[in-house]
Amino acid sequence: MKSVLPLLAVLLIVTVGCGGARPYRAMARAATSEENVFAQAQDKELKVQLREALLARGESPLAITPYVYMGRGFVVGFVGDGAQRDGVLSAAQGVQGLRSLQSYLPDRPTTSSTANDVATKANVKAALVPHPEIGVTHVDIEVLGGHVVLLGVVGSEEARESAVTAVAAVSGVKGVTNFLLLPEPGYESQRPHLR
């Protein structure tokens, strides 16, 4: 036991010295995003505020997922009934700084579809990989009862259409809601992308 502690200490020092644990996926996603870095930072801040507004209302952080792109807010998840849906939307609309708000909030089904939804999500990601114009790392995917919700910022109208076509062809997909956005003036990235 005594010889293990110095070894662990050395390992810790080496790990920290090599940069430590970094969120490499998030770093790569930010560097190749269609949004500029300032818009990404503002979106992160608005997303936190949106999540806090939902939590203050008593919503489970696992039931409703907030997203923000170019100042536009989205809330996605199952709700128990119309009253909960109205409450979620009311809380989200109270967030200052959001330019708009859209939602996909279907009623929770009586039977769980979680296992099928996880498998469908994996298949949807796999279907998007062969389309470099989409940039699968820039598309957030939610699957609710077999219905796929696509969110994010893509580089062209062709990429938006390709994403919907590819996803609709996946086995198990019952429908597609396309919340993919194109870069708007003032929000677009200022550097060329290598993909």
For the regions a language model picked out, list residue spans one by one.
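N-terminal targeting leaders
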Residues: 2-7, 12-195
